[in-house]
Amino acid sequence: MLRSLFAALLVISACLAAPARAQEGAAPFDADLQRLAEILGTLHYLRGICGSNEGPKWRNQMQALIDAETPSGDRRARMIAGFNRGYNGFQQTYRTCTPAAMVAIRRYIDEGSKISRDLTARYAN
């Protein structure tokens, strides 16, 4: 499941990069990207406390999304803020891995995968 999320993120990055560069304002998929950024931040924190030994994998996925999307100014700041909001929100709630944290991880992976699939279906050539 994690591999398919990574693959979907890469496809999204490639598909969205060109249209996003052509637009100065908000892209039609910005809300989805904001949510995806928040999910990546959440997973970066929760997977870390639950002993996944993934290191900066989720942060690297976020950076890859930013690099491919090349948002400027406010869009970039909103994406980064979304990632940080996801990370900080769960940092305040969970200090150790709990069964609830494991459930949250599964749910966020599922939601991120769905967003990735939907974006790919809508905006891929």
Question: Can you annotate each of these PLM segments?
Answer:
Residues 1-4:
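Positively charged n-region of N-terminal signal peptides that target proteins for export
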Residues 24-34, 49, 99:
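Short, solvent-exposed segments of well-ordered alpha helices
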Residues 25, 54-125:
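Compact alpha-helical subdomains of small soluble proteins
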Residues 18-22:
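Sec/Tat signal peptide C-region and signal peptidase I cleavage site
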Residues 6-15:
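Bacterial N-terminal signal peptides
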